[in-house]
């Protein structure tokens, strides 16, 4: 899932999911059910018949995430997946990401939102393109004697 959305604006949300589902090899007999499932995760069920050109920026973001989730991927690479998404939906999306992780899906998330980094199994802190620290969120906080990942970043950045 890229930070800028690569969607077909003149198709509906459903048609975008259908197209990408077929591209990912989702069997025709399972495609409708998968579309319904991912649309529910990102709260787009009621908007699937709308043209994507009529979607708000947040809706497009959620559609891109649904496209990333469709087709039982082995690896999800998500760039800022919940930016601009309301807290309750954000919680639901992370619940799904945890479920995917528990089912063996590898997930790589990039984010500037340190609260999101706290939710991951491992955190790689980058500064000027270099990894300046890498560990579990808890270990990063312990070894830097701070309470949040944001404080870890600020402390490591100083050194």
Regions found by a protein language model. Give the residues of each.
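Conserved ABC ATPase signature
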Residues: 10, 51-55
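Hydrophobic anchor residue at the start of the ABC signature
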Residues: 65
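Conserved ABC ATPase "signature" region
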Residues: 18, 22, 29-47
């Amino acid at each position: 899932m890229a930070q800028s959305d690569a969607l077909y604006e003149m198709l509906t949300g459903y048609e975008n999911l259908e197209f990408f589902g077929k591209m990912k090899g989702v069997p025709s007999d399972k495609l409708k059910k998968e579309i319904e499932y991912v649309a529910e995760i990102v709260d787009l069920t009621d908007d699937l018949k709308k043209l994507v050109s009529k979607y708000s920026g947040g809706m497009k973001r959620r559609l891109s995430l649904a496209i990333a989730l469709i087709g039982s991927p082995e690896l999800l690479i998500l760039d800022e997946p919940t930016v601009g998404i309301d807290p309750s939906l954000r919680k639901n999306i992370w619940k799904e990401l945890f479920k995917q992780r528990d089912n063996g899906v590898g997930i790589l998330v990039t984010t500037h939102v340190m609260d999101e980094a706290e939710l991951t199994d491992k955190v790689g802190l980058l500064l000027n393109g270099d990894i300046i620290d890498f560990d579990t969120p808890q270990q990063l906080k312990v070894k830097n004697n701070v309470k949040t990942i944001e404080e870890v970043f600020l402390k490591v950045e100083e050194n």
